[in-house]
Amino acid sequence: MAHAAQVGLQDATSPIMEELIIFHDHALMIIFLICFLVLYALFLTLTTKLTNTSISDAQEMETVWTILPAIILVLIALPSLRILYMTDEVNDPSFTIKSIGHQWYWTYEYTDYGGLIFNSYMLPPLFLEPGDLRLLDVDNRVVLPVEAPVRMMITSQDVLHSWAVPTLGLKTDAIPGRLNQTTFTATRPGVYYGQCSEICGANHSFMPIVLELIPLKIFEMGPVFTL
């Protein structure tokens, strides 16, 4: 999860997020290289007194500055397309959960567990227990197993919302009248936080998402939902 004064991305809790972090570092190194080359060329231009105004044609130079950017774009596009394909891939999920966005709370349906349905509201400051996070904790957490593929069906009852959990690398829009889906496999237990990531009205900042990830054996033993 996030912590105070954090500069980088949150620690990965899913294979997709691990791939996103690697791609982020890969793209950032290319950007740093481009910035260095531009600054170096600018430095040479400002400090040298040598000029050449008689050049009317530079075929080699034009070839280089046409091919080199194309190669750089390919180096960025190929891993990006690979990750984009992975995010849309559905690999035989163990079970399915439906998430419905409202102004300003979430409803969850465990369709594979007897049609369990519950609402998840942000905890007001007066109801926070020691250790709870202000504006992030909820009254009913979503309990999920680790090391099991989960399919999340996401929609909205009223306006546009977005179901996002950064540590899992998830962000899927909740659109009225449309059912979107995303899949993920958590790799380690813990409590992870997300928020609605689409401006949806006055209380947009007050509809957090809390996932409690537990070992699969414990999840299969019986009721673990804190309702």
Swiss-Prot record:
Membrane topology reported for the UniProt record: Multi-pass membrane protein
GO CC annotation terms, alphabetical: mitochondrial inner membrane; respiratory chain complex IV
Record: residues binding Mg(2+): E198
Transmembrane segments: 15-45, 60-87
Assembly with partners or alone: Component of the cytochrome c oxidase (complex IV, CIV), a multisubunit enzyme composed of 14 subunits. The complex is composed of a catalytic core of 3 subunits MT-CO1, MT-CO2 and MT-CO3, encoded in the mitochondrial DNA, and 11 supernumerary subunits COX4I, COX5A, COX5B, COX6A, COX6B, COX6C, COX7A, COX7B, COX7C, COX8 and NDUFA4, which are encoded in the nuclear genome.
Name of the gene: MT-CO2
Highest taxon listed in the record's lineage: Eukaryota
Keyword rRNA-binding carried by entry: no
Top class in the EC scheme: translocase
InterPro entries per UniProt: CcO_II, CcO_II-like_C, CcO_II_C, Copper_CuA, Cupredoxin, Cyt_c_oxidase_su2, Cyt_c_oxidase_su2_TM_dom, Cyt_c_oxidase_su2_TM_sf
Mitochondrial intermembrane side, ranges: 1-14, 88-227
Designated name of the protein: Cytochrome c oxidase subunit 2
Cofactor, free-text remark: Binds a dinuclear copper A center per subunit.
Species of origin: Pan troglodytes
EC number: 7.1.1.9
Annotated family: Belongs to the cytochrome c oxidase subunit 2 family.
Required cofactor(s): Cu cation
GO biological process entries: ATP synthesis coupled electron transport
Positions of Cu cation A1 binding: H161, C196, C200, M207
Role noted for this protein: Component of the cytochrome c oxidase, the last enzyme in the mitochondrial electron transport chain which drives oxidative phosphorylation. The respiratory chain contains 3 multisubunit complexes succinate dehydrogenase (complex II, CII), ubiquinol-cytochrome c oxidoreductase (cytochrome b-c1 complex, complex III, CIII) and cytochrome c oxidase (complex IV, CIV), that cooperate to transfer electrons derived from NADH and succinate to molecular oxygen, creating an electrochemical gradient over the inner membrane that drives transmembrane transport and the ATP synthase.
